[in-house]
Every structure is written in C-alpha cells, then in structure tokens.
C-alpha cells in the first residue's frame, strides 16, 4: 500500500517535470510548437528557413566570390563588392 502511494507521487512528479521541460524548450502543449513567436520571413532568405539567408550553390557546395560575399537577390546569385563568382568546375552553374 505504501509503495503504491510513492509510485503515484513519482508519476505526478515525472509528469510535472516533463511539462516544465517542454515549456522551457518553448514547445508548450500547443500543436504549433507553443512558442509565442511565429517564425517570419526575413529579407533574402528564400523562404522560412529560420532567418538564414539563402546562399548560392555550386552543385552541392556553397559558391564563393573573388570579392565580397555571395547572396541570392531576387532568385539570382550575386557577389557583393563588385566581385565575381569563382569557377565551380566542370559544367556546373551557380544556382540559388
């Protein structure tokens, strides 16, 4: 009888711990993850990918520039500081 009481207390404690842990992660008990902030699109991120800018690609690797940093503006790959893309190698084109 005494062990059942402790078992019930243990179950309640573990349940509370799980709820607190999920709230601390920002998940809560909601279908959408429970976070109070919605992810929003930022400029030049090519969709809702957590706010990270979309990077031009040479096949499966990130493209590099001779000057400046690579980015995708309006769906087209560009280099900052009037730079040019370094050669991808072969017939591979730079894509966004």
From Swiss-Prot:
Keyword tags: Host nucleus, Secreted, Signal, Virulence
Primary localisation category: secreted
Location within or outside the cell: Secreted; Host nucleus; Host nucleus, Host nucleolus
Any Gene Ontology CC annotation: extracellular region
Start and end residues of each stretch annotated as Nucleolar localization signal: 29-36
Function: Rust effector delivered into infected tissues to modulate host functions and contribute to pathogen virulence. Binds the TGA1a-binding DNA sequence to repress the expression of genes involved in immune responses such as the defense-related transcription factors WRKY18, WRKY27, WRKY33, MYB51, the defense-related proteins NHL3, RPP8, YLS9, AZI1, CRK11 and the jasmonate pathway and regulation genes JAZ1, ASA1, ASB1.
Protein name: Candidate secreted effector protein MPL124478
């Amino acid at each position: 009888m005494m062990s059942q009481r402790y078992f019930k207390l243990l179950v309640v404690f573990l349940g509370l711990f799980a709820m607190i842990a999920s709230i601390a992660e920002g998940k809560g008990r909601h279908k959408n993850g429970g976070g109070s902030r919605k992810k929003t699109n930022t400029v030049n991120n090519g969709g809702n990918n957590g706010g990270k800018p979309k990077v031009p690609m040479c096949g499966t690797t990130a493209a590099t520039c001779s000057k400046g940093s690579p980015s995708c503006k309006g769906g087209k790959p560009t280099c900052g500081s009037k730079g040019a893309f370094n050669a991808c190698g072969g017939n591979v084109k730079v894509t966004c």
